[in-house]
Amino acid sequence: MTHMALITMNYNSPTIGMHQNLTIILPEDVTFFDSSRTAKHLKSMLLLHGLSSDETTYIRYTSIERYANEHQLAIIMPNVDHSGYANMVYGHSYYDYILEIYEYVHQILPLSRKREDNFIAGHSMGGYGTIKFALTQSDKFAKAAPLSAVFEAQRLIDLDWIDFSPQAITGRDSQIKGTELDTYYLLDQAIDANVDIPELFIMCGKEDFLYHDNLQFIETLNKKGVSYKFEDGSGDHDYAYWDRAIKRAIEWFVQ
């Protein structure tokens, strides 16, 4: 077992126009400390938080560092506030910010740029971001794991949550069907463009309030001939489930 570096970073984001926090788990390969050896380029996962979470919650509520250590996987955890991983109408361009982070960490860290070495995962709102980036940035990620995902974005927009303003994301128009916020629309666009959609591993607990939304999205994948892997089983919309799910996702990513 190797040691893991836990990096808490604050850097000035050109996209957001202010300093942003970023948490990174990085395997400390022996080549990093020996100038006579060629440094190893690591596989990495972009891990997206949910609506009530941030860049620290996977570190605090799961065993993500131990799972990453077991498989020598770098984990990149950004913070996007309540943005829905979108370029907000009244707010910051968080979709573009995630793309900025991808480029930034691959420049400053010993991460492989090969598509087959890059993965993306996230829960709830982060699951929504996961499927959105899988469909629109498919050249970057070989595999994607949406966990307890919001596949029907209208549900996110209609959500009554503490200090959450969906109008900040969408503008005054609350109708998102057929827009870049609509995962079903993005799926159709990817299929029409003959995009090489990343392999999908969808997980959701049967007690989760989003379970039937997940089944509906899977039904659509079946109808459109898009391959995927699916696991459900017992589990609610909580970190007890996401701890198990992210472990399964990491094992699948590196197999």
Give, region by region, the residue ranges found by the protein language model.
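Non-catalytic cap/lid and distal C-terminal segments of serine-dependent acyl enzymes
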Residues: 1-255
